[in-house]
């Protein structure tokens, strides 16, 4: 049976107020198609255009079973390689091709990766609050759900809400999320001290710096958080300054997770080979999909680096499912970020889309139960999309504001 690519379409939908790009690859075999995630929420139309105007003509009529060949073809065809636009576009098609292969084999994807080495995937959820009392109340709520790993923040990533320009800013300063990095460090250390005093050490805790402080300040924060036994400190430095991780490794024992913004192998190869990080945190669509993510996972395994794939709200359930399938077969799995795509969802509930709409658009979501996530055993990724429901939630072209982080003097800081 020769399986040829017959059509490629991009479905744009925003059921929870977040722009999602879903790729559908049709084949010449009746009823055989695959779905993948190409979501770059803040540039969704650019990714859609690249897929429909460039990658689709390149791939029509080609053998859908030759995933590696097609990935290399897409990766090299534009000459300049990598980057979030190209990689997300490639990812959508790559995931869809793996979905097709799983359906042809009548197996869930984890079986094609060698089978399960664990039955369920332990996840960490996000807990936030305006003060320590509210944060501890939210921690208790997650404990009752069976969660054993939590990412704790106070007021987001350390800044005031967008538009609240502080009095410390100069005249004429632009709106933004203003960050006082020194106060943020003091408050964060105090936060984890109080959390440990209240709940003890049975809960594994994570904190996301989100690259928002200078590298020397990140080292100071890491050292001061050591007594509170964090599971890891996430993205302490910007991807342009990861050379500072060597200094951090020499000065602190806190486990380091890095890589949310990586989209080029040069950004992670030396960090893993030199064991400067403990967890690799890439967003798999940002590096080109399942094909490169599997290679990265296997590479990291050789150096004792564990996976902790990025799992935010701004990726579709197809990408969440891809994470889970890789996790199930990965000996060096660490923990999985889980933004909570099922009710009760404490992350996306405040967005402008109707709560629960994601469940109407996507079917077959991975199941969360008592701290673990489970893939269903349907062939391929196991997730489908109802296009009629998806059409009810059109994407919007809006200016991204949460990335406009500013320091006290009004200058921009990496988000």
What are these regions (language model features)?
Residues 120-247:
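Metal-dependent enolase-superfamily TIM-barrel catalytic cores that perform enediolate-based chemistry
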Residues 5, 31, 55, 93, ...:
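Conserved, mostly hydrophobic/aromatic
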Residues 1-16, 22, 103, 107-120, ...:
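N-terminal amphipathic alpha-helix/helix-capping segment at the start of soluble metabolic enzymes
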Residues 1-34, 39-40, 344-346, 359, ...:
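Structured beta-strand/loop patches that form or line metal/cofactor-binding pockets in enzymes
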């Amino acid at each position: 049976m020769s399986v040829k690519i017959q059509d490629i379409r991009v479905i744009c939908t925003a059921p929870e107020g977040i722009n999602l790009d879903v790729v559908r690859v049709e084949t010449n075999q009746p009823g055989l198609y695959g779905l993948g995630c190409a979501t770059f929420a803040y540039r969704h139309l650019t990714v859609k255009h690249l897929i429909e105007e460039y990658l689709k003509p390149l791939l029509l009529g080609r053998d859908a079973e030759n995933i590696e060949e097609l990935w290399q073809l897409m990766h090299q065809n534009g000459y300049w390689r990598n980057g979030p636009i190209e990689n997300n576009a490639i990812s959508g098609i790559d995931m869809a091709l793996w979905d097709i292969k799983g359906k042809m084999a009548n197996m869930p994807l984890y079986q094609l990766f060698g089978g399960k080495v664990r039955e369920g995937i332990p996840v960490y959820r996000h807990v936030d609050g305006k003060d320590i009392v509210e944060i501890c109340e939210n921690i208790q709520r997650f404990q009752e759900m069976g969660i054993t790993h939590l990412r704790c923040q106070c007021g987001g990533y350390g800044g005031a809400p967008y538009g609240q320009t502080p009095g410390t800013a100069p005249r004429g300063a632009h709106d933004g999320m203003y960050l006082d990095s020194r106060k943020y460090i003091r408050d964060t250390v105090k936060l984890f001290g109080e959390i440990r005093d209240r709940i003890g050490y049975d809960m594994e805790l994570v904190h996301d710096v989100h690259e928002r402080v200078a590298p020397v300040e990140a080292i100071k924060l890491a050292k001061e958080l050591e007594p509170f036994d964090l599971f890891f400190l996430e993205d302490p430095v910007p991807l342009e300054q990861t050379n500072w991780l060597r200094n951090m490794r020499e000065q602190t024992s806190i486990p380091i997770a890095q890589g949310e913004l990586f989209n080029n192998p040069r950004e992670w190869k030396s960090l893993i080979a030199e064991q400067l990080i403990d967890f690799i945190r890439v967003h798999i669509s940002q590096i080109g999909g399942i094909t490169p993510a599997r290679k990265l996972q296997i590479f990291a395994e050789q150096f004792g680096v564990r996976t902790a794939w990025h799992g935010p709200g701004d990726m579709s359930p197809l990408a969440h499912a891809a994470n889970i399938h890789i996790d199930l077969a990965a000996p060096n799995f660490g923990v999985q970020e889980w933004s909570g795509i099922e009710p009760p969802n404490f992350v996306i509930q405040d967005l402008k889309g109707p709560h629960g709409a994601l469940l109407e658009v996507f079917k077959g979501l991975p199941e969360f139960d008592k701290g673990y996530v489970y893939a269903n055993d349907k062939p391929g990724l196991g997730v489908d999309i109802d296009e009629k429901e998806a059409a009810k939630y059109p994407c919007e072209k809006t200016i991204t504001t949460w990335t406009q982080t500013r320091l006290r003097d009004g200058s921009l800081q990496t988000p």
